[in-house]
């Protein structure tokens, strides 16, 4: 079985061949934690969670190193902390917890490693120092350090933009002490506006903080090395962020290629416009949670359009996804088999005639819309089949395939919703939020809080089961 993935670097679909045939290294640009995520942000996380699942299917999860960073120092963060009059680290810590809660609601696996930018300032300083020594970067009298783009001849390799077109669209201030308009910042000096909110760090160039682009170069290098397999992110990151990452990393490590495959997902739009907070046309993940919408339905809505295409968010697309989830869950219930009862192995699944088309769809550049059609075809066969043994085999295939798409994490949501409402003071989306908060507490080694949450849910008739993969399932105690 071979995975084919579209590589933005080559502008074509390529067979995925990892650097190490037995393991895979993947880096994905994570959130800037100044505010809770909207569903456009969430779509990107779900896309790379699906890729993580497919890679785990092919190579086994323990052989995948998936790094997704947390940007916890940035202009937006500084401005929001000032606006709220709180410590910058309090803001980023609380927002990171909310991000984890929202992604848990959508059934996303935790990455293998989730480094924070502020924990890796030393690595960034070392890389910047190296770039200055090789002549690829320079410092200015006002304390800035810039990367000199003209020193890297392949600067436009990923974006394929010309410097002339970049100049036409440039919004850089002419007052900055840059040698060339396209040079980008590696280090920013501290100023009176940000020194009081802990947004500054010591460096050879004075107090300040790193530029955004150097953060990802440093963290991908620290946790994956000079060369790794896949780098992912939204299409809006192709330029300048990923373009600048390549320049920094290849110059800092001249013998490296950096990432072999560059993968980018399309925007989520509203009436044809990109969803963004600046346009005030956004819907947060929590807005949907408050409507008691199954997170699996939101996830399925994201996957109903190919990851590289724009996805327009509207009531119809969400309702269609909700109906499909209900149809699939009702089909599973009709066979009287539970998710926990499935015992088919990966080997059996790979050779299962019912799922060959499903797998081939996902291996073809993550063609999730086609994979969903395959799921529905399996469900239709289950409903038409009378032979119990054949029906059970089909259902087990449906369970495995649905789990690979990541839409079974809220299976009990539909099954137990009425019981929860009748027997508990906690509603389903609140259960998911509390579970995510408990997982974060365990990661923070706050065992008292983790135990308190378990006890709180238990007192409301909800039993938790911690699984070996780090996730937690729940059920109603009847």
UniProtKB/Swiss-Prot annotation:
GO molecular function, one term: zinc ion binding
UniProt short sequence motif 'KMSKS' region, positions renumbered to this chain: 274-278
Protein residues bound to ATP: 277
UniProt subcellular location: Cytoplasm
Motif ('HIGH' region): 31-41
Assembly and oligomerization: Monomer.
Cofactor mode of binding and number, as noted: Binds 1 zinc ion per subunit.
A cellular-component GO term for this protein: cytosol
Keywords: Aminoacyl-tRNA synthetase, ATP-binding, Cytoplasm, Ligase, Metal-binding, Nucleotide-binding, Protein biosynthesis, Zinc
EC number: 6.1.1.16
HAMAP family: Cys_tRNA_synth (MF_00041)
Gene: cysS
GO BP term (any one): cysteinyl-tRNA aminoacylation
Recorded family membership: Belongs to the class-I aminoacyl-tRNA synthetase family.
Catalytic activities: tRNA(Cys) + L-cysteine + ATP = L-cysteinyl-tRNA(Cys) + AMP + diphosphate
Binding residues for Zn(2+): 29, 216, 241, 245
Keyword Flavoprotein: no
Domain of life, per lineage: Bacteria
Coiled coil: none
Cofactor: Zn(2+)
InterPro entries (alphabetical): Cys-tRNA-ligase, Cys-tRNA-synt_Ia_DALR, Cys-tRNA/MSH_ligase, Rossmann-like_a/b/a_fold, tRNA-synt_1_cat_dom, tRNAsynth_Ia_anticodon-bd
Name this protein carries in UniProt: Cysteine--tRNA ligase
